[in-house]
Amino acid sequence: MVWHYTNDVALYCRAFRSMPHCLRERQYFMVKDHDLLLKLTGELVSVNINRYKCGYCGACVGVCPKGALELVETWIEVDESTCIKCGICDRICPVGAIEVMK
């Protein structure tokens, strides 16, 4: 399950990192309203990253709608003031290193 962002449109796909595949196979739906996106994913409070599980692939950084995640050397940094707690990073992480808690 993958969220891709193009401007203000979120494309939800079932296959990891396969935007061309999603567009070709029509295995996605679009969410244009970020408030609706928050309703779909739930309102969340904190983002915890398990640095021992994280492979630093950058998948979470690429899908963050607010750019709150940054890959700095060998760490993922979360800007809590920018993060909207949507939980998309949690859902995209291929190794389950991110946990967004209520």
UniProtKB/Swiss-Prot annotation:
Disulfide bonds: none annotated. [4Fe-4S] cluster 1 binds at residues 54, 57, 60, 93. GO terms for biological process: glycerophospholipid metabolic process. Residues 45-73, 74-102 form the 4Fe-4S ferredoxin-type domain. InterPro entries: 4Fe4S_Fe-S-bd, 4Fe4S_Fe_S_CS, Fe-S_Ferredoxin. Its cofactor is [4Fe-4S] cluster. Pathway: Membrane lipid metabolism; glycerophospholipid metabolism. SUPFAM superfamilies: 4Fe-4S ferredoxins. Keywords: 4Fe-4S, Electron transport, Iron, Iron-sulfur, Metal-binding, Repeat, Transport. It comes from the Archaea. [4Fe-4S] cluster 2 binds at residues 64, 83, 86, 89. Transmembrane segments: none annotated. This ferredoxin is encoded just downstream from the GGR gene in the genome of M.acetivorans. Ferredoxin that is the specific electron donor for the geranylgeranyl reductase GGR involved in the biosynthesis of archaeal membrane lipids. This is Ferredoxin. It comes from Methanosarcina acetivorans (strain ATCC 35395 / DSM 2834 / JCM 12185 / C2A).
